[in-house]
């Protein structure tokens, strides 16, 4: 099998590439250049997508004895990931750019180019498992990345390979060291790769600009003014610009954002509880939608807990009714659907949260 190994320069993708070589596949390594603008992406070992990371990936490819290329995806990354990230926050939503990158860059643009060049699969260092076309959680629950892959279609998964999903992260580092890979102890990246400072609020403010509005309580009383709804997300407690807790002494949280009126509403923690979610841009990883209501477990954050629910496709929207309230759900978040399984929860699909109700 001809395999294109996506190599970020980190330990996970390096071991993934090595395992594909060991399996006897015809492997070619590729690093994605996602920006040419100074200061746009992280540099050094703290993040991904830098020149240093490209060099690390090349050195690993040399050790493995495979061809290596750097492909320029900067323009598409800007349009499909960064610009959409900015637009979503301007709409008062809370997107996950890693989800968007997987859906539109790694397993769409990159995968399409790979297939056009005669490759059978794109292998990445994601912590997830594929078995019989079914996407499952990784063995290492703490590192599991199935959530950010739940947006992938059956066709996208058909050309994907996740060689390290059956191994805990500490063992991946040990394996890299045994193989003599210099990235064995390279730190993991945790922040958004295109925000060098790690300050998302400042990044958004510089690019979206000022659109002043009001912070109000449940009664509509104006508590403060703000410079733009992009500085807030549902469940936020700090940085609200208001003078301390409510009259009853309880902390106040962002409970709703109206981008049309630039209004941010705050309330108590209990106001964050939701029992129903509405999803758009629905994807079922099998390629076939269930014919009626179905039991599932849902997850709304990359490393969040799952909650039992009943979901149903109504037209082109997904209605999800929770068995118990879920707190702090924000429009724009990815809603991943799972089928519980002791051998590793299976991903059923996903949707983008369009609205919630209590």
UniProtKB/Swiss-Prot annotation:
- At the top of the EC hierarchy, this enzyme's class is transferase
What cellular component terms from Gene Ontology apply here? cytoplasm
Catalytic residue positions: 101 (nucleophile), 193 (cysteine persulfide intermediate)
What reactions does this protein catalyze?
S-sulfanyl-L-cysteinyl-[protein] + uridine(34) in tRNA + AH2 + ATP = 2-thiouridine(34) in tRNA + L-cysteinyl-[protein] + A + AMP + diphosphate + H(+)
Where is the site Interaction with tRNA?
A: 126, 333
One MF term from GO for this chain?
tRNA-uridine 2-sulfurtransferase activity
Interaction with tRNA: annotated segments: 143-145
* Pfam families assigned to the protein according to its UniProt record, in alphabetical order: tRNA_Me_trans, tRNA_Me_trans_C, tRNA_Me_trans_M
EC number(s) per UniProt?
Answer: 2.8.1.13
Q: Which InterPro entries match?
A: MnmA-like, MnmA-like_C, MnmA-like_central, MnmA-like_central_sf, Rossmann-like_a/b/a_fold
GO BP terms: namely: tRNA wobble position uridine thiolation
Q: Where does ATP bind?
A: 6-13, 32, 125
Cell compartment(s), UniProt: Cytoplasm
Keywords of the record, alphabetical order, are: ATP-binding, Cytoplasm, Disulfide bond, Nucleotide-binding, RNA-binding, Transferase, tRNA processing, tRNA-binding
What cystine linkages occur within this chain?
101-193
Give the record's family classification.
Answer: Belongs to the MnmA/TRMU family.
Summarizing the function annotation, the protein's role is: Catalyzes the 2-thiolation of uridine at the wobble position (U34) of tRNA, leading to the formation of s(2)U34.
Protein name per Swiss-Prot or TrEMBL: tRNA-specific 2-thiouridylase MnmA
